[in-house]
Amino acid sequence: MATAQLQRTSMSALVFPNKISTEQQSLVLVKRLLAVSVSCITYLRGIFPECAYGTRYLDDLCVKILREDKNCPGSTQLVKWMLGCYDALQKKYLRMVVLAVYTNPEDPQTISECYQFKFKYTSNGPIMDFISKNQSSESSMSSADTKKASILLIRKIYILMQNLGPLPNDVCLTMKLFYYDEVTPPDYQPPGFKDGDCEGVIFEGEPMYLNVGEVPTPFHTFKVKVTTEKERMENIYSGILSPKQIKTPLQKILMDKDDLEDEQEHYINDDFDIETKMEEQKKKLGSSELGEPNLVCEEDEIMRSKESPELSISHSQVEQLVSKTSELDVSESKTRSGKIFQNKMANGNQQIKSKESRKRSQLESGKTVLHHFDSSSQDSVPKRRKFSEPKEHI
């Protein structure tokens, strides 16, 4: 038991550094927070098969970390995208990463769910913040506080992903990168990305918005937000959010409005009732270990850490992804976290209208139509800003 605990402590230290006193240490933390966040989301949403993940422990929380796997070209492609994000982050160009889920391989602009990761940089470097309503963003935090905030953010992502209704069985991924235009060279593109040609997207169904959290260091700030279909939020209302935190969303998704969206409360608050939810899960599952609900964790499974700037992926692998993105066999009413949902949620492909009729009904009703991820509330007409999209989609 003591050996297992020592092993977990060692693995946790490998994920998040214990000391954040230099810009390089802060950059490492931000990179790893992004990697762990994306890994948690894709794992619990059933995007890739089990073989595409290694295992780590953050204190008592078991997390799955995405890795390259020859049997899962999609995970290799996403790792390649992440390396492109790291390049832009290191140069202090990157402002926001949008990871989007869509169902029609021919129409990546019509999305079903998306996750935003937003970065800010101080004069000394970059920062990732987790700030509660009563906490000042300017308050100094120790390395221990930063690490606690980082782990809390991952816990919140886990709780949210485990309680969202399931995605359709076959989904695809795309990613958009947005920059600080005033410092980013006009011709800059991270490895694996090209200049984007369609900034706006259309959302399937009625969207709901969640501020998940932030994490601070003396050098960077990183925010996590989620937009999903209202129907998938059914379990969230009763299980995680208090009534005062449920807000009526805007019809139009305004993803990034120069930080004004928080003041105008366009998103649901980020104060999840984590302690209550974890206790409920422990009772239901009979688990004696906090933070590991329904996750298969092997003590000896270690993630392969690859920092290679060059990742190869064949054209045939990409074609295979287009035809069949997810190799995971997900049942109609059960998510990877093990939670059972009503068939009306899981059977999304049968219940949702055709793409054209859905778009038509949205336009007629005035509901969610084309929106810009990067529009400013101060501009009457959204300003065209530089952004990138992948050369190859998943």
Curated annotation (Swiss-Prot):
Keyword hit for Nucleus: yes
Gene Ontology CC annotations of this record: chromosome; nucleus
Residue ranges with Polar residues bias: 311-325
Modified residues (Phosphoserine): 376
Modifications the protein undergoes after translation, according to the UniProt entry: Phosphorylated at Ser-377 in a SPO11-dependent manner.
Record keywords: Chromosome, Differentiation, Meiosis, Nucleus, Oogenesis, Phosphoprotein, Spermatogenesis
Domain of life: Eukaryota
Subunit structure: Interacts with HORMAD2. Interacts with IHO1.
UniProt function note: Plays a key role in meiotic progression. Regulates 3 different functions during meiosis: ensures that sufficient numbers of processed DNA double-strand breaks (DSBs) are available for successful homology search by increasing the steady-state numbers of single-stranded DSB ends. Promotes synaptonemal-complex formation independently of its role in homology search.
Name of the protein: HORMA domain-containing protein 1
Lineage of origin: Eukaryota, Metazoa, Chordata, Craniata, Vertebrata
